């Protein structure tokens, strides 16, 4: 039974998708580090330009890239969380869609860490052992097992994913903290809109068109000096 996002559900989402939750998301940039090195988010060299360039980059990922695919996969995992065979197939598909070795490592490492930490509440993924689990699939399944609505889980996941990217941008000295908060404030409406849209999707809605982001993700492993694992 699905419940509305009451106080208990809100607290759980804030806990699971908080930077303090021990999944290690801070170690990954999803290729952003390589994009910065290659000057793809230079924005003309000004602080405002870099802020706008990062906002555009993240908006593309949200609407047409890996973050969109994550949303579709999360929604599907939420729907089939108590059907082990279907949940396994969704996770396998998510892993197959990882566009590079580092992205595969990122989603499986985060998925494993999230699953382990979330066992304090539930482990709806036990039937998938010992197979690796993609991060959005783990989040969707755990959220559904606790009766939290799909749209709320999606919104929290999307916000966390974008916050992680903004944090990476700050650590890469692309933007400052004030600029990062400005970006997150402007992404609130797009996140809410995409969460509502993703609830209505199926696996046929998977697909991305962010080729530059996919390329830098694949090239990142060859970067000589790195702060991040992806």
Curated annotation (Swiss-Prot):
Q: Which organism is it from?
A: Allorhizobium ampelinum (strain ATCC BAA-846 / DSM 112012 / S4) (Agrobacterium vitis (strain S4))
An annotated GO cellular component: cytoplasm
PANTHER family named among the record's database cross-references: UREASE ACCESSORY PROTEIN F
InterPro entries (UniProt xref): UreF, UreF_sf
For the keyword Chaperone, the answer is yes
Q: Name its cellular compartments.
A: Cytoplasm
Spell out the subunit comment: UreD, UreF and UreG form a complex that acts as a GTP-hydrolysis-dependent molecular chaperone, activating the urease apoprotein by helping to assemble the nickel containing metallocenter of UreC. The UreE protein probably delivers the nickel.
Keywords attached to this Swiss-Prot or TrEMBL record, sorted alphabetically, are: Chaperone, Cytoplasm, Nickel insertion
- Record's HAMAP family? UreF
Mainly resides where? Answer: cytoplasm
Kindly provide the name given to this protein in its UniProt entry. Answer: Urease accessory protein UreF
Q: Name one GO molecular function term.
A: nickel cation binding
| Function according to Swiss-Prot or TrEMBL | Required for maturation of urease via the functional incorporation of the urease nickel metallocenter.
In Pfam terms, one family for this protein is UreF
């Amino acid at each position: 039974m699905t419940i509305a996002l009451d106080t208990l559900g809100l607290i759980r989402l804030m806990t699971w998708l908080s930077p303090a939750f021990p999944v290690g998301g801070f170690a990954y940039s999803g290729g952003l580090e390589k994009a910065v090195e290659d000057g793809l988010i230079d924005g003309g060299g000004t602080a405002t330009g870099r802020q706008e360039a990062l906002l555009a980059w993240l908006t593309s990922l949200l609407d047409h890239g890996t973050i969109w695919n994550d949303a579709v996969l999360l929604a599907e995992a939420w729907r089939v969380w108590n059907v082990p065979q279907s949940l396994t197939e969704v996770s396998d598909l998510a892993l197959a869609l990882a566009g590079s070795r580092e992205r595969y490592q990122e989603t499986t490492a985060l998925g494993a860490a999230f699953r382990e930490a979330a066992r304090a509440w539930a482990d709806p993924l036990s039937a998938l052992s010992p197979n690796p689990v993609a991060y959005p699939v783990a989040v969707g399944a755990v959220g559904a097992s606790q009766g939290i609505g799909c749209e709320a889980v999606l919104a929290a996941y999307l916000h966390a994913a974008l916050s992680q990217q903004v944090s990476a941008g700050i650590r890469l000295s692309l933007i400052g903290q004030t600029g990062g908060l400005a970006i997150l404030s402007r992404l609130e409406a797009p996140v809410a809109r995409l969460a509502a849209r993703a609830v209505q999707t199926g696996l046929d809605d998977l697909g991305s068109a962010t080729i530059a982001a996919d390329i830098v993700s694949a090239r990142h492993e060859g970067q000589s000096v790195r702060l991040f694992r992806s």
